[in-house]
Regions:
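A short secondary-structure junction signal
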Residues: 33-34, 62-63, 72-75, 108-109
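Charged helix-capping and loop-helix junction motifs
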Residues: 76-81
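Metal-dependent phosphoester-hydrolase catalytic domains
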Residues: 50, 82-95, 100-160
Length: 160
């Protein structure tokens, strides 16, 4: 189903590991996983891929899972913004998605102001989607931010 994928391993345990993944129908031409951990007990990464979409061109896709504490998230947002400013050409199409653990809705204002990103569910429905816990979502922790193109439909996946 997904001929292209990138996986950035962020933490390794005796019983397995965890990280971020990007799945694509289109060729992933490059990828890099950056350590954005805010402290040693909570390993976090920023997975950055460049995807080549036939007839459209290249798009930068970033996947994150931010810290549980607000101070850590703030530092991680700073790292994400620095990465985008350094590597992604100004105004170039971009998707930034993942678990932002953004209980207070602070990331969106910062990402809009500094990178020109909009959140797809906020644009469509007026607020981010409920996505956690998966079985009965009540919290709005996951986000999809974009720039450089229009999103016509977005939904929370409820399958397994």
């Amino acid at each position: 189903v997904w001929p292209e994928f990138a996986y950035g391993r962020n933490a390794v345990y005796d019983h397995g590991h965890h990280g971020n993944a990007i799945l694509s129908r289109f060729p992933i031409v490059s990828w890099e996983n950056l350590d954005v951990s805010s402290h040693i007990l909570e390993r976090r990464g920023l997975l950055h891929c460049e995807v080549d979409i036939p007839g459209f061109g290249r798009i930068h896709c970033l996947c994150v899972h931010l810290a549980l504490d607000e101070r850590g998230r703030s530092r991680q947002l700073h790292q994400i913004i620095e990465r985008v400013v350094e590597v992604v050409p100004d105004g170039h199409p971009l998707i930034l998605a993942g678990d932002f653990n953004d209980w207070r809705n602070r990331a969106g204002r910062r990402l809009a102001g500094e990178l020109g990103l909009t959140e797809v569910f906020r644009d469509d429905r007026g607020r981010p989607a409920r996505s956690f816990p998966a079985g009965f979502p009540i919290f709005r922790l996951d986000r999809i931010y974009v720039r450089g193109f229009s999103v016509y439909h977005a939904e929370v996946h409820h399958g397994h």
